[in-house]
Amino acid sequence: MAYEPRGDHGGGGGGQGQDGAFVKVRGRRPVTDYGATITHWQHDRAPGYKGGYTGEAERPSASYIVDMLPPAARVTKAADSIPIKHLHSSLNKIKHPINVVRWTPEGRRLLTASTSGEFTLWNGTGFNFETIMQAHDSAIRALEYSHSDDWLISADHDGAVKYWQPNFNNVQSINAHTDPIRDLAFSPSDSKFVTASDDSTLKIFDFALGQMESKLEGHGWDAKSVDWHPTKGLLVSGSKDHLVKLWDPRTSRCLTTLHGHKSTITKVLFEKVRGACLATSARDQTARVFDLRMMRDICLLKGHEKDISTLTWHPVHPNLLSTGGMDGSLFHYLLDSPNPPPGQSFTVAPYDSPDPTTVPAQSVWPTHKVPYAHDYAIWSLDWHPLGHILASGSNDRITRFWSRARPGDAEVFQDRYHIGEAAAEAQGTWDRRGGRRQRQEEEQQEMEDEMDALVDQDAPKAGVPGLPGIPGLPLGGLPGLGSAVPPPPIPGVGAGGPPPPLPFPLPGLNGSLPPPPLPGLDPNNPPDPAQLLELMKKAGVPLPPPGALPPGLLPPGGIPPPPGGFGMPIPPPPMSALEAEKAENVRRRAPLPSQEDSLRHEQRQGKYTRAR
């Protein structure tokens, strides 16, 4: 993990600006940059037929930070990828419980969905705010990206499902259920998706048509979770009736029912790497891992003191499973390491038993605990696609990021997330006043990030300020003002009728003779206005009155004559390039700019002018 410098290096709280004003200096923000570790691994690794990694091995010293490797470089060492270090806590200015957290497919941003129906986008490297938008009218309960990374679907408490493009352009909305939707999942081909609702049913929809194809009925109570196997035509669902069911999506038939829990099922999830296991969690303080080949549970995950609310598999290590509890605790399990506490004996795994069909499931305790990860229930967990950062969303309205500790970082086990605020304050690893000050600084940073947020290029541009209300013309979008009153009709003039006769003849009009040329005025070389006024005085031509109307000509009825010295308003001076850029960087609660508009903007600046 690197650090982004924000301000000077002296540790002061501020300094003098160029104009002598006091300038507040922000502290450094933690930034995770995985580019260096990926490059280091790609540079030093050897081909498969010549052996493995040839670089320096990591050791518990800060000097070995440069030798850190990504999880893909150590697939068989899941213990090195356990996220024990707290990186950052992100929170909105207007706080709501976080129901779902999802990394974007490329891993550059984290998308969170709250009970207010809003999408919030956080930067995946610096964890700062990027944009926010109102996506649903009610609480968002589920999010899922397609396997092709081209689509995002979301479901809310009203039973609606919405289609989104990667730039968060809402394409379609369908009313899938009349009750809240608790979970949804894409099929391996992305041609269909399935929803689980409180009406106790599962529904399979055709993604392209947005129409329901089949309804899966069999649960006796609310369906709380559903998942589609990553490579096979197999569905799994968990319900409030304590049952886990496996379904055939082609025939809508229930294949089998797994009886392993004694309370409401909170999460069911297939393992994505090998696809041979299924993890389930429930409100009975346990989680279970089922082997689909044996159709039985092989691991019983213990250790939680409260109910388990969610779980997630690691994207690289198939034996690393993380769970979140109703009390805000975050536990990490290695399925091949039972890790029993003192006083508990080892149990035999079904794989090692002579009769694997009758032996009970092996009890597994957490390899690492973060008891105080959140203050309230953890509703969602999601791993970065590379597997080096875990994001958690909680009922305490905070989104937190977790990662592995750097070599030599031993104080991570003594922070307030591991031992609590009181114990950490007693040991001097956390200050209550400093914690409040840090929270205020984080909120201030998020407010400043909102000011620098992404811009919606499709938003209407504001009118030119400074123009008064001209009759018959709009006011250019001035705040708080409407359009001007249209001018009254002129008596005797109808739509399409002839213009009224003038009360006096004007030279050159109505067949009259043109005005005589002014003496000393060359028609081929017009003079400047000052010279023209001087010639008009010498020729005896009367100057126009201050009202800018010829003598005898009255203004139209209903419009007062302009006062003396009246002139058109001076247009505002053109904005500089810097001011125009600042005016454009105004936060709008709207979708992200489209890629096409962004490309045009870059091309106008002289970038990306040629195809690559």
UniProtKB/Swiss-Prot annotation:
Keywords: Chromosome partition, mRNA processing, Nucleus, Repeat, WD repeat
Compositionally biased tracts (Pro residues): 486-506, 544-575
GO terms (BP aspect): chromosome segregation; mRNA 3'-end processing
Region listing for Disordered, in residue ranges: 1-21, 424-450, 486-514, 544-612
Matches recorded under InterPro entries: Pfs2-like, WD40/YVTN_repeat-like_dom_sf, WD40_repeat_dom_sf, WD40_rpt
Subcellular location(s) of the protein: Nucleus
Function description: Required for 3'-end cleavage and polyadenylation of pre-mRNAs. Also involved in chromosome segregation where it has a role in chromosome attachment to the mitotic spindle.
Protein name: Polyadenylation factor subunit 2
Organism: Gibberella zeae (strain ATCC MYA-4620 / CBS 123657 / FGSC 9075 / NRRL 31084 / PH-1) (Wheat head blight fungus)
